[in-house]
Amino acid sequence: MVCEKCEKKLGRVITPDTWKDGARNTTESGGRKLNENKALTSKKARFDPYGKNKFSTCRICKSSVHQPGSHYCQGCAYKKGICAMCGKKVLDTKNYKQTSV
């Protein structure tokens, strides 16, 4: 669960946008280069499990969180009805029987 404010912070999918004016994958905006070797230019974006950008742990159950920038895992966020990134209350779970099975 993610609130509307934190939804903007979520990562984007790598697939290119459909062509339109102002798309982020056109060469005019500097987004996508022609004839570029992806193996040489993607070293910064590669996943490094032991590097600086490690995933954090959940503040409730201490398991690893698989979403960068989140403080709570999806199971705990669903049970408590909070945003996984900021912890803001998203859903009133008073009359619900929440399980994460």
Curated annotation (Swiss-Prot):
Q: What is the effect of changing residue 100 to D?
A: Abolishes interaction with DLG4. Strongly abolishes interaction with DLG4
Key words, A-Z? Cell projection, Cytoplasm, mRNA processing, mRNA splicing, Spliceosome, Synapse
What tissues harbor this protein?
A: Expressed in striatum, cortex, midbrain, Purkinje cells of the cerebellum, pyramidal neurons of the hippocampus and neuropil. Expressed in heart, brain, lung, liver, kidney and testis.
Q: Which subcellular locations apply to this protein? A: Cytoplasm; Synapse; Cell projection, Dendritic spine
Q: Give the record's GO biological process terms.
A: cytoplasmic microtubule organization; mRNA processing; protein localization to microtubule; regulation of postsynaptic density assembly; regulation of postsynaptic density protein 95 clustering; RNA splicing
Segments spanning the bilayer are none
**Main subcellular location of this protein, as a coarse class:** cytoplasm
Q: One Gene Ontology cellular component annotation?
A: glutamatergic synapse
Annotated spans, Disordered: 19-38
GO molecular-function terms, A-Z: microtubule binding; PDZ domain binding; protein-containing complex binding; scaffold protein binding
Q: Where is this region: PDZ3-binding?
A: 98-101
Asked if the keyword Signal belongs to this entry, the reply reads no
User: Sufficient for interaction with DLG4: where is this region?
Assistant: 95-101
The similarity annotation says: Belongs to the CRIPT family.
- Which proteins does it associate with, and in what oligomeric form? Component of the minor spliceosome. Within this complex, interacts with RNF113A, as well as with SF3B1/SF3b155, SF3B2/SF3b145 and PHF5A/SF3b14b. Interacts with DLG4 and TUBB1. Interacts strongly with the PDZ3 domain of members of the DLG4 family. Associates with microtubules.
Role according to the record: As a component of the minor spliceosome, involved in the splicing of U12-type introns in pre-mRNAs. Involved in the cytoskeletal anchoring of DLG4 in excitatory synapses.
Name used for this protein in its record: Cysteine-rich PDZ-binding protein
Taxonomic source organism: Rattus norvegicus (Rat)
* Protein encoded by which gene: Cript
